[in-house]
């Protein structure tokens, strides 16, 4: 099965929230906006990118990349705030496709590092490591070169 990765549309948000229910359940009471409202806003913000994975026009996964300036990183840092995959689909392939797009987007936006919360599941950690992410304290990160800056990331 082929998986298409594309930028999320506002109409994708309900499905993305449904897929991420276990992940975002904790955050429902954390702030004034629920996950659905926040993701809807992120679709339009220039400091965030929301991606979905599609199979036969069904959303089967998604990822959120949030950007922030970082003096320590020497430019922008991209944070993979959310990455979810429908368990009925090929988790490895969908995760790989989403991470490829997230890293490409981070490089295009001038990020010098991409970070994420360190996965506790060994299989999930292996999927991230295949993309070059390494443990860095309580988080995992991948140093990337911004487009036009010379060296690119290695695998």
How would you name each of these model-derived features?
Residues 52, 58-67, 84:
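Conserved beta-strand in the GNAT
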Residues 1-14, 148-155:
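Conserved N-terminal entry element of GNAT/NAT acetyltransferase domains
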Residues 29-50:
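Active-site rim helix/loop that mediates acceptor-substrate recognition in acyltransferases
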Residues 85, 91-104, 130:
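Conserved acetyl-CoA-binding loop-helix of GNAT-fold acetyltransferases
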Residues 18-31, 71:
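Helix-loop element at the rim of GNAT/NAT acetyltransferase active sites that forms part
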Residues 87-90, 115-126, 143-146:
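Conserved beta-strand-loop-alpha-helix junction that forms the acyl-donor binding cleft
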Residues 74-87:
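Conserved acetyl-CoA binding element of GNAT-fold acetyltransferases
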Residues 106-118:
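Conserved GNAT acetyl-CoA-binding A-motif
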């Amino acid at each position: 099965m082929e998986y298409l990765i594309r930028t999320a549309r506002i109409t994708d948000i309900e499905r993305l929230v449904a897929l991420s229910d276990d992940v975002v359940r904790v955050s429902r009471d954390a702030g004034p906006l629920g996950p659905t409202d926040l993701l809807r806003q992120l679709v339009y913000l220039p400091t965030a990118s929301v991606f979905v994975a599609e199979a036969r026009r069904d959303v089967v996964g998604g990822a959120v990349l949030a950007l922030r300036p970082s003096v320590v990183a020497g430019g922008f840092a991209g944070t993979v705030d959310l990455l979810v995959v429908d368990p009925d689909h090929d988790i490895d392939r969908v995760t790989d496709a989403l991470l490829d797009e997230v890293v490409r987007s981070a490089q295009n936006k001038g990020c010098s590092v991409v970070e994420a919360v360190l996965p506790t599941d060994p299989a999930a950690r292996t999927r991230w490591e295949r993309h070059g992410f390494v443990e860095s304290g309580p988080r995992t990160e991948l140093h990337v070169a911004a487009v036009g800056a010379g060296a690119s990331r290695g695998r």
